[in-house]
């Protein structure tokens, strides 16, 4: 049985019963951007590697879940509950698809979203969105980044030329972690192009913020500018939120801050900031921590949104059922269920948590160029998901 829910999302379902075991994945992707070695919109296989946008986030995992359902059905296992694979189309930009699902469809009894890492995710940090605005700046234009939930890995800037400034900037950029940079001077202007390193907003320390590096180097070489000072003192190239009073951590992780997009409109520079908040901190905690630290004569920061975290106790039946499926297939008992900075459908749909398919410590280039997945890992994930569905049918 397949159902289209007003083009927000759809689902494929098998089995019978009142209760529903749900699997929720997404078909939308982030913009391509960057330099790809292969066509991002064509599946390219090189040995065990399969390249393309969405191979890991999240079209590949959706297919893994679909094949797990097929194998389970073909095995003859009695389905005492319905098993429903929900496919959304708006996860990357707000999960409006799952909000619509909640409005028009039945609540899930239990389930998972294959949009994170194995062995199991029993908590997701809270989310905070901010925008930084310039008040006074000599910067003529500055633009970079593609989405708010990824490190700004490409950025351009235009500033007024000053004697010796081009050479000073080139020397400063040479001592940074930029992959590439270019500084040119013409018609009284200096043009800067910087290429950093992409990374997901939940793990910004894995990336290099090209915009942040430009701001840092401008101040380093003596370019006097009010907004440059404001950005460097409040955001900078660190990822811990110390500049706005938000540096904190709990037993499950620390706060992270990511600058995703920089743009210039009508002479005002704005920077989108994506913050992931430790699971034990509430909205009132965060607001009080940054109170009085978001504005001065050089710039201002607006809080756009604060979303609460998700947390399931380690010993909950849902966590135990999914973790057991992972251990039974892989034999891995060293890695334990964990809390992550990423946000998934688990925050929108009730009674589910994130479960696979990524391996810990592996960079699948999600939200970056040459995103990939391994065929062998996909095959293993299918088996894990099949066992997981069996376990969920039993709780």
Residue positions per predicted region:
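Active-site metal-coordination/substrate-binding segment of hydrolases
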Residues: 20-87, 93, 104-109, 368-371, ...
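A common structural junction motif
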Residues: 28, 173-181, 221-222, 292-298, ...
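Short, charged/polar, Gly/Pro-enriched secondary-structure boundary elements
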Residues: 16-22, 199-201
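Short secondary-structure junctions
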Residues: 1-4, 45, 139, 180-183, ...
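A non-catalytic alpha/beta surface segment that caps or lines the substrate-entry region
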Residues: 1-19, 41-44
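An extended, acidic, His-containing surface patch that forms the Zn2+-binding/catalytic region
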Residues: 3, 198-266, 272, 276-288, ...
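Beta-strand segments within the central parallel beta-sheet cores of soluble alpha/beta enzyme folds
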Residues: 80-88, 141, 229-232, 303
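Midchain, well-structured core segments that form catalytic/ion-binding scaffolds
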Residues: 92, 98-278
């Amino acid at each position: 049985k397949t159902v289209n829910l007003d083009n927000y999302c759809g689902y494929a379902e098998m089995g019978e019963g009142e209760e529903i075991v749900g699997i929720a994945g997404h078909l939308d992707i982030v913009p391509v951007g960057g330099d790809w070695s292969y066509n991002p919109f064509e599946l390219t296989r090189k040995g065990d590697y399969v390249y393309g946008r969405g191979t890991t986030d999240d079209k590949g995992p959706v297919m893994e879940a679909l094949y797990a359902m097929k194998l389970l059905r073909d095995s003859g296992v009695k389905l005492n509950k319905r098993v429903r694979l929900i496919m959304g189309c708006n996860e990357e930009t707000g999960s409006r698809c799952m909000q619509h699902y909640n409005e028009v469809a039945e609540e899930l009894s239990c389930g998972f979203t294959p949009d994170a890492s194995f062995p199991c995710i029993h908590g997701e940090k809270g989310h905070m969105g901010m925008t930084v605005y310039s008040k006074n700046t000599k910067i003529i234009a500055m633009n970079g980044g593609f989405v708010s939930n990824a490190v700004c890995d490409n950025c351009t800037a235009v500033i007024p030329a000053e004697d010796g400034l081009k050479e000073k900037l080139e020397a400063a950029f040479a001592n940074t972690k930029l992959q590439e940079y270019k500084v040119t001077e013409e018609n009284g202007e200096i043009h800067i192009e910087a290429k950093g390193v992409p990374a997901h907003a939940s793990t910004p320390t894995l990336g290099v913020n090209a915009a942040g590096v430009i701001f840092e180097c401008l101040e380093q070489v003596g370019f006097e500018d009010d907004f440059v000072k404001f950005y460097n003192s409040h955001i900078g190239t660190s990822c811990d939120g110390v500049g706005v009073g938000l540096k904190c951590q709990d037993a499950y992780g620390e706060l992270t801050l990511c600058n995703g997009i920089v743009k210039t409109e009508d002479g005002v520079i704005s920077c989108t900031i994506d913050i992931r908040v430790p699971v034990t901190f509430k909205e009132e905690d965060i607001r009080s921590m940054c109170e009085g630290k978001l504005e001065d004569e050089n710039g201002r920061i607006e809080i756009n949104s604060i979303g609460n975290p998700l947390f399931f106790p380690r010993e909950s039946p849902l966590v135990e059922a999914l973790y057991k499926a992972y251990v039974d297939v892989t034999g891995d008992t060293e890695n334990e269920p964990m809390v992550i900075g990423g946000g998934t459908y688990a925050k929108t749909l009730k009674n589910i948590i994130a479960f696979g398919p990524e391996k810990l410590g592996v960079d699948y280039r999600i939200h970056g160029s040459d995103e990939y997945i391994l065929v062998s890992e996909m095959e293993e994930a299918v088996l894990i998901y099949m066992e997981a569905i069996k376990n969920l049918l039993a709780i």
